[in-house]
Amino acid sequence: MDQFIQLVEASQVRNDLPDIHPGDTVKLQLKVIEGEKERLQAFEGVIISDKGMGTSKTITVRKISNGVGVERIIPLCSPNIESITVLRKGKTRRAKLSYLRKRTGKAALKVKERKVFTPSK
């Protein structure tokens, strides 16, 4: 039975998503259905946690909107995710960045930037 579940999960996992970690600043394009219309809604913020693995993996994204902190828990295998763009790579020493909830203003989104090395030819 366990092998069957793994086989089904392997066929459902999305491979088109970038490599993301807590501390990264991302921009999500989410499909929103209102009545009969469908549109894309952007949600830009810092990943403060990720949880689970495989098809049950979720991320928590936090942003400050009009001075109020807004968090969204998003399942990564959701068909409502159109795209995920990594705007900044964050350098963190923690897996859960819940301490960002206590901060206000610009400090609420401040995470050190990770240096990304590209091989030179």
UniProtKB/Swiss-Prot annotation:
List the keywords (alphabetical): Ribonucleoprotein, Ribosomal protein
Q: Which GO cellular component term is one of those annotated?
A: cytosolic large ribosomal subunit
GO molecular function annotation: structural constituent of ribosome
Q: Does the keyword Ribonucleoprotein apply?
A: yes
Membrane-crossing segments per the record = none
Q: Name one GO biological process term.
A: translation
Key word Ribosomal protein present in the record? yes
The role this protein plays is: This protein is located at the 30S-50S ribosomal subunit interface and may play a role in the structure and function of the aminoacyl-tRNA binding site.
Family under the similarity heading = Belongs to the bacterial ribosomal protein bL19 family.
* Cross-referenced NCBIfam families: rplS_bact
Name of protein? Large ribosomal subunit protein bL19
Q: Which gene encodes it?
A: rplS
